[in-house]
Structures are given as C-alpha cells and as structure tokens.
Amino acid sequence: MKTLILKKLALISLLSLACASWVHAAERIAFIPKLVGVGFFTSGGQGAVAAGKALGVNVTYDGPTEPSVAGQVQLINNFVNQGYNAIVVSAVSPDGLCPALKRAMKRGVKILTWDSDTSPECRSIYINQGTPDQLGGMLVDMAANQVQKKQAKVAFFYSSPTVTDQNQWVKEAKDKIAAEHPDWEIVTTQFGYNDATKSLQTAEGILKAWSDLDAIIAPDANALPAAAQAAENLKRQNVAIVGFSTPNVMRPYVERGTVKQFGLWDVVNQGKISIYIANELLKKGDLNVGDKLDIPDIGIVEVVPNRVQGYRYEAKGNGIVVLPERVIFTKDNINQYNF
C-alpha cells in the first residue's frame, strides 16, 4: 500500500513538473520590427529583451532584412507554428498583415503592435509613441523654430507611402501647416523605402531639385540622417533638417551644427512597455480601456480608446497605450541619451 502511494505521489510530481514546464515554454513573446539592421529598431528590441529577462519571459527579437509584408507574414506564421503565445509587431502595412494576425488570434495568440499600427481590429493593444497630432505637431514646430521666412519651401521625406505611423504624422503635419503656416509651400513628398543608400540619393535629389528649399521634414530613422548627410555633402547648411531618429545616429550631425533640433521618444522604453503589456495580457486574458499598469522605472501607463489615433473601431480588449513622453534633442541635451 505504501509503495502504491509513493508511486502515485511520484506520478503527481511528474505531472506537475510537466505542466509547469509547459506553462513556462508557452510564455514566449516575439518582438518584430519593420526590419533588422536599423538602430531605432535594434534599440526597441534591446528594451524588449531586457524586459523579458526582468519578467522571466522568453522574448525573441527578429525581423525581415527588408521591410515587406511578405517578410513579416512569414515571421508571424513561423512564430505561431513554433508555439509563441504573444506577438508584438511594428507593421509595415495597416492591412497587409491582418489575415495572418487574425489567424494567429483564432489560435489563441495575443497580438499587439508597437511603433506602427495595423487596423485596430487586427490586434489587441497598440503601444504608441504618440498620437498623430502630437507627433505631426512636433515636426512642424521644430521646422517653424528655424524657418523665419513667411513664404517658405518645405519637403517631406520619409520611408514609404503605405507605412501606417509616418503617414498619419505627415497628414497631421500638413494639416497644421495649412492652418498655421498657409504661405509655406510643400514642394514635394518623397520616400527612401528604409534603404540607407536610396535615402541618401533621394535626399540629395531633393536638395538639387530645389536650390531655394528652406526645410526637409523627415520623420523616419533612415531618412533623417540621410537628409543631414546630403546637406553636408552638398554644403547646404541653410536648410533646416528636422524629423525623428535616434540620438546615437544623429549626434555627429548635431555636434557639427547640421541639425539643430530633432525629436523622438525613448524607444528602449517602448520595447520595455510592449513586453510588460504583452505579459499582462498573457496573465489576465485581456486589457480594456481604463486599465492601468505600473511599469518599473517608467511609471503608470493606461489603456486609452482607439479614437486617440483617429480610429472609429472600439471593442472589448482593444485599445492603445501611449508612451508617457516625447523628447526634442538639441546640442544641449543630446549627450544625456544613449540609444
């Protein structure tokens, strides 16, 4: 009898260990950028992986080598098939990933977006660096701080005509220009397609085509340094170069005076927040508008309605977490940041 009881206890222990191992294995989160090899996304990935270690969750950072729907869909499908139970993706297209993401959700995978959103029905929570009016407004204000002419010529230059986040910011920026700077002329809107060489060529082409250009607004991590390098190559120090990129990439241009102001947010914290939110979804099942989470070294973040991003779609377990702050970098503060 004693032997039988011991065998049963041993069996229960083995089953408990098996269950614990299965649960631990299931706590895997994939963190996907638009593409690898770009400092902005690498920094976000570092924040995500560090958060995973702090939480005891396995976080994998991986992305395509080129920004494409097909590349991201392949990664999403691979992660789902490998048993990952949460995916956080910076989407190259608002709709192109939706079929794959909806299939993943039907299989019980938690889907979140960061940096660049999908249509809201294709994910649960979007970890958002700022609303379109916040970021579009930053772009115009940085240019206006440097352009003193009433009748100025301005070019927009960023990654692609289909990427969600940047097009939302640019729309708001153009609306703000029309309302507050009606005499500014937007002479062109061009794209570098996340390619460093093409971005430099495009930026040089813009400067050559408009010898009297007053500003380039470049809300893209590749486009902004390319515009700054093009201005240096062509000795066009009279053009205001503003936009979004990381301080480590832009530091030399700020130190040389080519760029007076540029903006961003703490993308390391964005990666960290993304993983904390994903982990909370794995524990609770969902998060709803009004729910809050206290994240170490960052503070309290709150789920807000999709309408802050201009969406009409609202649903249970669906919303947006907006980063607490954004930063304008200048020569006076850039050395306080290292990412």
Swiss-Prot record:
Pfam families hit by this protein: Peripla_BP_4
Segment forming the signal sequence: 1-25
Alphabetically ordered keywords of this record: Periplasm, Signal
Primary site of residence: periplasm
One cellular component term from this protein's GO annotations in UniProt: ATP-binding cassette (ABC) transporter complex
Molecular-function annotations in GO: carbohydrate binding
Cell compartments where the protein resides: Periplasm
Complexes and interactors: The complex is composed of two ATP-binding proteins (LsrA), two transmembrane proteins (LsrC and LsrD) and a solute-binding protein (LsrB).
UniProt protein name: Autoinducer 2-binding protein LsrB
Lineage: Bacteria, Pseudomonadati, Pseudomonadota, Gammaproteobacteria, Enterobacterales
